[in-house]
């Protein structure tokens, strides 16, 4: 997903996939803090913010223990407020259902504690979010079904796309729309 986003000009954070046996020297040059998370979990399971190299190995072990596939994503930390975007696509046409402001515990685990929907965004920012997410859905060739996109918006209004799941959001986001 991240490779597709980068190739298509969608704004993902820099990230590296760590599989069992990967030489961790591939992470040299990444800027701290880092986010370490399993590739295949939801609900913030196994996510850790790492401030320094000495804590990296333990975070990778923790994420791998939470992963079904035993694969871990290490990404550069993205500043900004976190949002999720719920969409439904039918025959390649995307429909924005809601943008949700997310509240979390913050570092180091980022466990969600609450939501506000609709998110208090200007019409201009809402359109910018819609445009970024729809382009990313096209990048992933999503034609039919629900999607749950996660992104961050910094103070300058820049959007970084974290990920897209082919499902509705959890924590009652979909049912409370």
Model-based region annotation:
Residues 1-73, 79, 90-92, 115, ...:
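Active-site nucleotide/adenylate-binding loops and adjacent lid/helix of ATP-dependent enzymes
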Residues 63-71, 76-120, 127-161, 165-173:
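Phosphate-binding core of ATP-grasp and ATP-grasp-like enzymes
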């Amino acid at each position: 997903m991240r490779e597709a986003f980068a190739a298509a000009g969608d704004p993902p954070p820099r990230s590296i996939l760590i599989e069992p046996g990967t030489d961790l020297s591939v992470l040299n040059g990444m800027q701290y803090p880092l986010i370490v998370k399993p590739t295949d979990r939801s609900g913030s399971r196994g996510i850790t913010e790492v401030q320094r190299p000495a804590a990296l190995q333990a975070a990778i072990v923790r994420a791998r223990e939470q992963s079904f596939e035993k694969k871990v994503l290490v990404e550069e930390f993205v500043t900004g407020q976190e949002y999720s975007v719920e969409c439904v696509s039918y025959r390649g046409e995307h429909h924005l259902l809601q943008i949700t402001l997310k509240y979390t515990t913050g570092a180091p685990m980022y466990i969600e504690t609450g939501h506000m929907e609709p998110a208090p965004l200007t019409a201009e920012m809402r359109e910018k979010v819609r445009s970024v997410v729809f382009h990313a859905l096209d990048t992933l060739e999503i034609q039919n079904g629900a999607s749950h996109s996660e992104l961050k918006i910094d103070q300058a209004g820049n959007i970084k796309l974290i990920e897209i799941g082919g499902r509705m959001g959890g924590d009652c986001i979909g049912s409370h729309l």
